[in-house]
Design a protein with these regions (language model features):
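Bacterial N-terminal signal peptides that target proteins for export
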Residues: 1-8
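Short loop/turn microsegments at loop-to-beta-strand junctions
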Residues: 29-30, 52, 133-135
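Bacterial N-terminal signal peptides
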Residues: 9-17
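Structural micro-motif
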Residues: 107-109, 127-137
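Short active-site neighborhood of thiol/selenol oxidoreductases, capturing the structured segment around
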Residues: 45-67
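Structural microenvironment flanking redox-active thiols in thiol-disulfide oxidoreductases
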Residues: 67-105, 116-121
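N-terminal "domain-start" segment that seeds a small globular fold
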Residues: 19-45
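Thiol-/selenol-based redox modules, centered on thioredoxin-like
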Residues: 132-176
Length: 176
């Protein structure tokens, strides 16, 4: 067998094995404990039976698409804040880098840091080159995956998230 055939066989095997572990609608979302740019540590468990959450995974801070997505969420976050949901952006960047990125883009929502890449791998967003793919995961109050968006338009991220949350039946936030 030639080296090209061996490589092709390995790649096919890898793609088949990866496709069998993809996070799907109805799956229990993997728990996580991640530090955020607001100084807090968040877990999936803390939202159980309380609130839906959205995690918008992005490849790397300070890159063009990620900056556009972050600005969309910062500028149009009111659309999401009107709904009974907590939303995050998440990457495998260091907490310090994410803090700088959040400050530069005036993000008024937490950015999660997963430098170990374990949570990104559990959420099946980690690409073969070690960075997350731009995927957004919607999780219900029960901790189950409601939707995985693998086709993100960075410039309309906030609007698209709000529309999807409404489509998924996430209610508006109750006045306190």
């Amino acid at each position: 067998m030639t080296s090209n055939n061996v490589l092709l066989t390995l790649l096919i095997g890898l793609s088949i094995s990866l496709s069998t572990i993809a996070l799907e609608v109805g799956d229990q979302a993997p728990d996580f404990t991640l530090e955020a740019t607001d100084g807090k540590t968040y877990t999936l468990e803390q939202f159980h039976n309380k609130q839906a959450i959205v995690i918008a995974w992005y490849p790397r801070a300070f890159t063009s698409g990620c900056t556009i997505e972050c600005k969309s969420l910062a500028n149009n976050g009111h659309l999401l804040k009107a709904l009974d949901v907590t939303y995050f952006m998440a990457s495998v960047d260091s907490l310090e880098k994410n803090k700088e990125f959040a400050a530069e883009n005036e993000a008024d929502f937490p950015l999660l840091s997963d430098p170990s890449k374990k949570v990104a791998a559990a959420y099946d967003v980690l690409a073969f080159y070690g960075m997350p793919m731009r995927h957004t995961v919607y999780i219900g109050k029960d901790g189950k995956v409601l939707f995985v968006d693998r086709n993100i338009q960075a410039s309309t991220s906030a609007e698209d998230m709000a529309a999807k949350l409404k489509e998924l039946g996430i209610p508006t936030r109750q006045a306190s």
